[in-house]
């Protein structure tokens, strides 16, 4: 479980929450945008997904069946956005990491029945790409040819994946396909 000062404990739009990825030329956010995303937001942290689900008024669709994906932080933002931070590493064997090379990548997943931008990420991106994955329209925000953010709506729920290290479109597709009600 991450401590209370973690970036994962911050609600929407914290300037330090989503640093500009390498190789990204345009990454801006105005003070006005920043202030408007920070008004009166709450964040409630839970010990596990089961506990968090009891506090939602919907049954969230979540990623499952992906090798090496472990939830490390669970919270609800503004009472109706479930946020799960996953640690991911190809060689993840357990909870502890022996070498710096073994440090995981972090993936933030948010799901809600709210429409609109639930990512909390308001920077400008070039390029943006849209594709259809299993009859679902997915929008990617890209860094070079890699995905930094993927968002889509399905089954009355709004979904977002944010990757602290951009991933291939194929990997993003695999993760999107893993999301279902469980």
Which stretches of residues belong to each language-model region?
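Surface-exposed amphipathic alpha-helical segments
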Residues: 155-182
């Amino acid at each position: 479980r991450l401590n209370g000062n973690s970036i994962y404990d911050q609600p929407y739009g914290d300037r330090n929450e989503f640093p500009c990825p390498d190789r990204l030329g345009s990454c801006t956010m105005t003070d006005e945008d920043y202030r408007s995303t920070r008004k009166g937001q709450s964040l409630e942290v839970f010990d596990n997904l089961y506990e968090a689900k009891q506090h939602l008024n919907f049954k969230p669709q979540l990623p499952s069946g992906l090798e090496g994906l472990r939830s490390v932080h669970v919270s609800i933002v503004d009472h109706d956005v479930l946020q799960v931070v996953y640690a991911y590493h190809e060689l993840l064997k357990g909870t502890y990491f022996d070498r710096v090379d073994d440090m995981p990548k972090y993936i933030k997943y948010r799901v809600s029945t709210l429409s609109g931008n639930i990512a909390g990420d308001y920077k400008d991106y070039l390029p943006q790409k849209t594709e259809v994955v299993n009859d679902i329209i997915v929008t990617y925000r890209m860094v070079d040819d890699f995905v930094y953010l993927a968002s889509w709506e399905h089954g009355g729920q709004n979904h977002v994946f944010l990757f602290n290290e951009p991933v291939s479109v194929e990997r993003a597709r695999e993760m999107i396909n893993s999301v279902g009600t469980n």
